[in-house]
Amino acid sequence: MSVLGNHLLNCAGFHAADRGFGIATLNENHYTWVLSRLAVELENMPCQYEGFSIQTWVENVYRLFTDRNFAILDKEGKAVGYARSVWAMISMETRKPADLLTLHGGSITDYVCDKECPISKPGRIKVTEKTPVSEYQTRYSDIDINGHVNSIKYI
């Protein structure tokens, strides 16, 4: 699952970069992307060494968040799964969410696509107990470009 998760994040990054909203462009303006939520539903998990591809599109852009969806396709191009994600652009200085519409004059909304994603939007998970579920020893290789533990390490 972590390999698929990394492919989803890379696909999102390439898609954003091709449209002028990649991490390098955001960093020039002291912003960065952070993944807030991710939901993945698969009918079939691609086997090791089996070819697959990923399509991605932006469903919505709000002031502080954007919804990005994915279709996971087998080697014949048939959808075998979908994913939905919620991303925020944060200030690298304050670490707080930043207004997505301030970058490039709000042109990020030009990339909203009217394409269906058949799975439910990821919601917040309500924590009812304050008991730790597990512990994880962070390694240097777990840290991403933002200085956070990479989202996929949580899967």
Predicted regions and their residues:
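Short, hydrophobic/π-rich interface segment
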Residues: S151-I155
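Hydrophobic, proline/glycine-rich low-complexity stretches
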Residues: M1-G51
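Short amphipathic
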Residues: T128-S141
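Generic structural signal for alpha-helix starts
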Residues: M1, L101-T102, R139, N150
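A generic structural signal for short, non-catalytic loop/turn and secondary-structure boundary residues
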Residues: E28-W33, K78, V127-T131
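HotDog/MaoC-like acyl-thioester-processing domains
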Residues: E41-R124, T128
